[in-house]
UniProtKB/Swiss-Prot annotation:
This is C-type lectin domain family 5 member A. N-glycosylated. Contains sialic acid residues. GO terms for molecular function: carbohydrate binding; virus receptor activity. Residues 1-4 are cytoplasmic. PROSITE patterns: C_TYPE_LECTIN_2 (PS50041). Residues 28-185 are extracellular. Functions as a positive regulator of osteoclastogenesis. Cell surface receptor that signals via TYROBP. Regulates inflammatory responses.
Length: 185
């Protein structure tokens, strides 16, 4: 008998079992479901009206689907659409809503890197707004943004990403392209 071949085969089997165990152990933690709800505030003059008086529920980071509509980019179970037309932040939100999506919530480093790679040299609105009453940035799902925004000033309550590879404050009334996001099917 060739003991070297048998031992090599056993080592390969053990490594496969260990690898599969780690995969099954960490898969739910990496791709676990996080449901959040968004309820817009109705304070005129602070940030744009997002969805009127309706509530919107969606899962911003998780989906096990793999199919996106034509013209959308797939990343980690989500579909992303980069508009070619420029609109105000409110009109960008409405544009995404008509496509069954929302402005992108860039809440992981992987998603940020992916969007920076596909956005090129353009600036795109995302779903991040400054809340002057709270003096903090919030995503449209009402979660707090813990990063930093460049060039924030009095009337720059919306955010773009793209050209500079950073989160840049922008006027909500200036026209930019937008990034829409929804679950893959």
């Amino acid at each position: 008998m060739n003991w070297h071949m048998i031992i090599s085969g056993l080592i390969v089997v053990v490594l496969k079992i260990v690898g599969m165990t780690f995969f099954l152990l960490y898969f739910p933690q990496i791709f676990g479901e996080h449901n959040v709800s968004f309820s817009p505030t109705e304070r005129p003059g602070t940030v744009p009206q997002i969805f009127g008086s309706s509530n919107v529920s969606f899962t911003p980071t998780e989906s096990f689907g793999t199919v996106c509509p034509t013209g959308w980019d797939f990343h980690q179970g989500r579909c992303f659409f980069l508009s070619t037309s420029e609109n105000s932040w409110n009109n960008s939100m409405n544009f995404c809503k008509q496509k069954g999506s929302t402005l992108a919530i860039v809440n992981t480093p992987e998603k940020l890197k992916f969007l920076q790679n596909i956005s090129g040299a353009e600036k795109y609105f995302i779903g991040l707004l400054y809340q002057p009453a709270e003096k903090m940035w919030r995503w449209i799902n009402n979660s707090v943004f813990n990063g930093s925004v460049i060039s924030h000033s009095h009337n720059f309550n919306c955010v773009t990403i793209g050209l500079t590879k950073t989160f840049d404050a922008a006027s909500c009334d200036v026209n930019y392209r937008s990034i829409c996001e929804k679950s893959a099917q």
